[in-house]
A protein has these predicted regions:
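Catalytic loop of the DD-peptidase/beta-lactamase superfamily, centered on the K-T-G motif
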Residues: 1-13, 19-23, 28, 83, ...
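Active-site-proximal loop and beta-strand segments within enzyme catalytic domains
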Residues: 5, 16-127, 143, 175-180
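Secretory-pathway/luminal and periplasmic proteins that interact with or process carbohydrate-rich
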Residues: 10, 58-66, 77-83, 155-165, ...
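Well-ordered alpha-helical segments within folded domains of soluble proteins
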Residues: 32-33, 129-134, 200-204
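Short, well-structured active-site flanking segments
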Residues: 38-56, 65, 140-167, 214-222
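Residues at helix-coil transition
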Residues: 41, 73, 111, 154, ...
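Mid-domain, small-residue-enriched loop/turn segments at the edges of structured enzyme/sensor domains
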Residues: 67, 126-129, 160-173, 177, ...
Length: 296
C-alpha cells in the first residue's frame, strides 16, 4: 500500500519487497487512457480518429468505424470480450485450472474481432475496447504498446507477453482459496489489464497525478456520464464518496487485486496492491478518506 499527501509519502509492505511486481489489472486501462490523451495533446490522434485509420481492420465490418474517444469512455458499443475469443471455454479453464484467459497476440486479437457487432453507443465496460484503444494509439505513435508505455509513463512499468518474460521479482498471485493462479500475460491484453508494477512505481505515479506533472493528466477529468451519478474521463471514474469527489480505478486478475484513488482537492491519494484475488475497493476508499480528512 502507498499513500501520498501534501506533506508526506508512505509505503507499507507485507510479504513483498520494493522490487516485487504485482499485476495491476484494469488500472492498466487508466494508464492507457493517459497514453491516449497524451497522444491527442501531441497531435498524433484526435477524439474522432477511428480504429480503421490505425489498425488493419479492412473487411472487419463496423469495428473499424469506432472512434478512439468512444473507446476511452466505454461508449463504443463493443462487447466486453470478442465472441471469437471463445470466452466460455476460456472461463472454464480459468475457474477449473487457474489458466490465463488472455494470452493472445495482437494479431490473434484482431482476428477475433471479425464477428464483433457494434451495438448502441451507451456506457458498457469493455476489455476489448481498451485493448484496441491501446494498440491503436501505439500504432499512431509508430511504436508497440509496451514501448509507448515506457516512453511516456516510464520504463518501470512492464508488460510481459509470455510466462518466460517473468522473473523472480514478479509475484505469483493466488485466488481467495489460496490456489496459485497462472499469470495474466499476453501482448493483446496489456492495454486493458496486462501491466505489472511495483508499489514504489505506483506511488510515484500517484505523486505525479496529484501534482499535475504526469503526461496525459486530462484522462482523469470526466467528460461523460458513466451512470447518472458517476462521471468518466479516459477510463478514470469520478464519483462522490461521503461528500468528497474521488477519482479512481480498480483492477482484478486471476490472482491479484488493486485500487488507486485520488481526492484531488485534498492533494491526497492511495494505491493498494495485493497478490490475492479479493477486492480491496472498500479498504482503498476507507484509507483515502482517513488521510484526506487529515490533510484538509
Amino acid at each position: 500500500m502507498a499513500v501520498v499527501t501534501p506533506d508526506d509519502e508512505m509505503t507499507a509492505r507485507v510479504g513483498s519487497n520494493r522490487h516485487s511486481t504485482f499485476e495491476i489489472g484494469s488500472i492498466s486501462k487508466g494508464l492507457t487512457g493517459m497514453l491516449y490523451r497524451n497522444a491527442v495533446e501531441r497531435g498524433l490522434v484526435s477524439s474522432t480518429t477511428i480504429l480503421g485509420e490505425l489498425l488493419p481492420l479492412e473487411g472487419y465490418g463496423e469495428v473499424g468505424s469506432v472512434t478512439l474517444e468512444s473507446l476511452a469512455t466505454h461508449r463504443s458499443g463493443l462487447p466486453g470480450l470478442p465472441p471469437g475469443m471463445h470466452p466460455l471455454r476460456r472461463t472454464l479453464g480459468f475457474w477449473i485450472r487457474g489458466e490465463n484467459p488472455y494470452g493472445d497476440s495482437l494479431a490473434g486479437l484482431l482476428d477475433q474481432t471479425h464477428a464483433v457487432r457494434v451495438g448502441a453507443p451507451r456506457p458498457r465496460y469493455s476489455n476489448l475496447g481498451f485493448q484496441l484503444l491501446g494498440h491503436a494509439v501505439a500504432e499512431a505513435a509508430g511504436s508497440s504498446y509496451a514501448q509507448l508505455l515506457h516512453d511516456v509513463l516510464g520504463p518501470e512499468f512492464s508488460t510481459p507477453a509470455r510466462v518466460a518474460d517473468l522473473g523472480p521479482a514478479d509475484l505469483t498471485g493466488f485466488d481467495r482459496f489460496g490456489r496459485p493462479m497462472q499469470p495474466w500475460v499476453g501482448e493483446a491484453i496489456a492495454p486493458a489489464g496486462g501491466i505489472r508494477s511495483t508499489i514504489d512505481t505506483m506511488r510515484s505515479l500517484l505523486r505525479s497525478l496529484l501534482d499535475g506533472t504526469s503526461p496525459g493528466m486530462s484522462a482523469l477529468d470526466p467528460t461523460a456520464k458513466f451512470t447518472p451519478r458517476v462521471g468518466i474521463g479516459a477510463a478514470w471514474i469520478t464519483l462522490e464518496h461521503n461528500g468528497r469527489s474521488i477519482t479512481w480505478h480498480n483492477g482484478s486478475t486471476g490472482g491479484f487485486s488493486s485500487w488507486i484513488g485520488l481526492d484531488r482537492a485534498a492533494g491526497t491519494g492511495v494505491v493498494v496492491l495485493t497478490a490475492v484475488h479479493r477486492s480491496v475497493d472498500r479498504q482503498g476508499f476507507r484509507i483515502l478518506e482517513e488521510f484526506a480528512t487529515r490533510a484538509r
